[in-house]
């Protein structure tokens, strides 16, 4: 009963029976991807859904963030640099350039989990397919039957998210597998990302995605576009372990800062790292070499403008993430704060600076009402309102229930 504020007779009725309906969580996603480890003590957790509710629990079972690596070199400018390197920063004389390429592949599940919890995510499950050195699609193809069987054993999972799949050329095969093998039970809902291609028209992206996704169980999936420029990683995350020098490069800049003493110090660090010996010729231990790399990184950041610009570019590159994990957090937040009857739309996103591609009203028409009915939900920026999820349709857009 409420607080008594006026005199009178009040009758308080007691419930004769308990609630007949047990309250359950309605938005519990499972994330499938690559992690640093997958251990509960000494027991392997590979291919098994593990229930967590915070990044602290994630770190306990699955380890920390990956350390993506980018190979740097200072070389003569060549005609095919744009095809071979991710970034190129020419010097003032346009003869040499600071060049950067990706070493191996980049694992992103950790960053997606940060986005999920930042946008209202709570209880969820994580399935680790393997470590950071593995290939997502290879492990997915080899273990999907086991993974799907284990997911079906958990009663409270309602959504499926595979945020790393979109980085692969085979992502549409992953999506169609999910829709065919999991969503056929009408219990699971898949959140999908739309592949991005630089310079591509919105209509072409929509058509390509619609062609690849097929026609099976589209009413149990939603797709979101575009990708997001996030703030998951900070400047401090781009350190000497991420930016790795190729010390066998063809040339070395004659000057970094123009200050002879600074340049001498930087070249001294480069020599120590490349030879694994200090100035006196003594062998350096691994920890000592790493410290020299850190000192070199800090000196270059402070004294070489091209290096500082490249570090920012690398950070922005890593912070460009597809939206499915953030949307899983939004689904959870909306269900918990408003109720399952409220659509997960017209909601702001956290840890997001802006959509990677500005979506206009015309673009939204293309995404929202394609001829095939395979609707894609847009994420847009509005003046005075910020970034909003601007759509809540399933991929079965021609359905009356969409």
Tell where the protein language model's regions lie, with residue ranges:
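Surface-exposed assembly/interface segments
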Residues: 1-402
């Amino acid at each position: 009963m409420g607080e008594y504020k006026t005199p009178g007779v009040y009758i308080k009725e007691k419930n004769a029976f308990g609630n007949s309906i047990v309250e359950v969580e309605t938005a519990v996603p499972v994330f499938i991807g690559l992690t640093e480890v997958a251990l509960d003590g000494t027991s392997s957790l590979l291919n098994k859904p593990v229930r967590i509710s915070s990044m602290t629990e994630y770190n306990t079972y699955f380890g920390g963030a990956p350390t993506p690596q980018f190979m740097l070199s200072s070389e003569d400018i060549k005609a095919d640099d744009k095809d071979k390197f991710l970034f190129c920063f020419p010097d003032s004389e346009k003869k040499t350039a600071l060049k950067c390429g990706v070493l191996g592949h980049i694992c992103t599940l950790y960053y997606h989990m940060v986005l999920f919890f930042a946008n209202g995510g709570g209880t969820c499950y994580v399935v680790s397919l393997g470590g950071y050195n593995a290939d997502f699609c290879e492990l997915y193809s080899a273990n999907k039957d086991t993974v799907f069987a284990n997911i079906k054993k958990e009663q409270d999972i309602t959504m499926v998210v595979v945020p790393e799949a979109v980085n692969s050329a085979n992502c549409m095969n992953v999506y169609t597998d999910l829709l065919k093998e999991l969503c056929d039970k009408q219990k699971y809902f898949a959140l999908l990302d739309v592949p991005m291609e630089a310079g591509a028209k919105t209509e072409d992206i929509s058509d390509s995605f619609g062609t690849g996704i097929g026609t099976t169980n589209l009413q149990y999936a939603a797709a979101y576009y575009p990708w997001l420029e996030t703030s998951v990683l900070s400047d401090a995350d781009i350190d000497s372990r991420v930016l790795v020098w190729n010390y066998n490069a063809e040339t070395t800049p004659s000057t970094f800062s123009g200050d002879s003493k600074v340049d001498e110090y930087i070249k001294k660090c480069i020599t120590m790292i490349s030879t694994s010996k200090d100035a006196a010729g003594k062998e350096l231990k691994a920890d000592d070499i790493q410290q020299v790399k850190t000192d070199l990184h800090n000196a270059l950041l402070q004294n070489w403008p091209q290096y500082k610009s490249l570090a920012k570019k690398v950070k922005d590159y890593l912070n460009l993430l597809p939206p499915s994990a953030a949307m899983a957090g939004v689904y959870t937040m909306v269900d918990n704060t408003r109720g399952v009857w409220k659509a997960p739309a017209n909601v702001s996103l956290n840890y997001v600076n802006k959509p990677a591609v500005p979506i206009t009203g015309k673009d939204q028409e293309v995404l929202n009402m394609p001829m095939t009915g395979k609707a894609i939900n847009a994420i847009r920026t509005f003046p005075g309102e910020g970034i909003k999820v601007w759509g809540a349709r399933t991929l079965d857009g021609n359905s009356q229930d969409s």
